Amino acid sequence: AKSTQEQYDYEPMKSNRWKKVEPVVKSYIGNTLHLLGQLTDASMTSLVLRRLAASVAFLKPFERLTKRVTRTTLMCFSSGEPRLRVSAIVLLRAIAATCPGPALERAVKGVYRAYASNAKFMNANSAENIAFMSACVVEMFGIDQNQSYGLAFAYIRQLATLLRNALAQKTKDAFKSVYCWQYINCLECFERILTAHASNREYSSKGSGEQTTKDGSTSVLRPLAYPVQQIALGAARVLPSARYAPLRIRLLKILNRLSRSMETFAPVAPLALELLNFSELYKAPMSTKAPSPDFTLALRVSKTELRSPAVQDVVVESAFEELGEHYFFCCFFVFYSKTYSHR
């Protein structure tokens, strides 16, 4: 049996018998697409997608069929069925890794847009699916970083434009376009992309100051770390309020993870200290029977919840935790830099 990479690298057009089997292959793919359009059972659809993934090398000569397969598979990926979503991303990744450049761009765009569409709401039921789709986006952006850079740059610029409008217009709609789950989830997704594919854990300095991979190639996505960091810093300043403590804590985590993985400084301390100094946290706590909100599933808390001792404890503990991690990294980075410079 051939390995997965051997299946991807296989070029059926180079076979002497290709002209004879080409109509059969084209008919097979077309009929499979028709079957996918008629199926309603998730298990059967998943099986068909898996068989298509095993035959993905035969899509290379047929650009129009590849577009149709990608479109249909993206619809399956966007569905709420977890098993179907797994089979769909396996096929999409195979298409992106096997077929010519335009196929990769379509697949990466489609997966990211499906994620962004599903990331609008966050609750206990959707959190796991959103996390899985985020991991899929990270995987897709790492297939070809040269092509992924342009797409990532465009999507990050969209986030920056929304932030700029919120800071300039100061309207309710502009504000809501930033302080919402879709915006925060997309920003967090790009932080994960950079951590996975441009981290200093994956790159080593060659003495010229340029970050290079183990095989000598230059990191392509790494320059995007700075705009992502600036967006996170700007988003935290849109509406400085203790009611949005869960959102700010989430942004602090993004900044700390990005700072640690890129080995760059981010001014986390002022944001954390400002959070600790909000006057609402110094008001006398009020006992309440209502359960404390889960900060991983909330972007803001109500005025009543903010007076709850449990909520105040979580805010203070989380702020100190992120502040401690920030200072620990700063001390480690200074020590490491001095040690490295004396070698």
Enumerate the language-model features and the residues they cover.
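Flexible loop/turn segments at the boundaries of HEAT repeats in alpha-solenoid HEAT proteins
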Residues: 57-66, 96-108, 141-152, 195-206, ...
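Conserved hydrophobic register position within alpha-solenoid helical repeats
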Residues: 45-52, 87-88, 133, 186, ...
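Eukaryotic scaffolding regions of large macromolecular assemblies
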Residues: 160-343
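Long, low-complexity, highly charged intrinsically disordered regions
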Residues: 1-34, 97, 105, 109-129, ...
